[in-house]
Amino acid sequence: MGQGRDLAPLTEKGVQQAEAAAHDARLKDIKLIVSSPYTRALQTAAIISRITGAPLTIEVDLHEWIPDLTFRFSTGDEAVALCEDFNRCRGEYPVGETRRWETLTALRKRVRAVADKYAHMEGVAFVSHGMAMRTLRTMHDVGYAEIVELDYNPDMPDCVYWDE
């Protein structure tokens, strides 16, 4: 399984969701679409680009959280267990220990570095993944093809990832 899960295309329903999102009035004035390189996000971004006419660029570091930095997990159950461990540890390795998953600190640093590159621009749409986007704005869940507005500032404090 490993990283192969990131290579699956959108389902027919996913294509319909992307097309519906592309017609949302909030995207009518976008100037640039910045996408994750992972297949479903990139396919969503391409659909939005085609419908809105906005140019599309890919940012390699805008990808989803990495549940296994070795890319060797082999089952869905193993991926779920890694995610549960991440949540149990609140995204950080216990003192003196390491885990296979990417820490919240590393995820946040990676995604914010991408957002920082575009912070000076107006009308930028990021197409990425729930866990990655949750590092930029406090929110519990991000739906498929959901539009979440954010007035990003590189100096803003880190958002809350979990309810306290």
Segment roles from a protein language model:
Residues 107-120:
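A short, acidic, amphipathic alpha-helical segment used as a generic capping/interface helix at domain edges
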Residues 120-130:
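Generic beta-sheet signal
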Residues 39, 62, 131-132:
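Catalytic metal-binding/acid-base residues of hydrolase active sites
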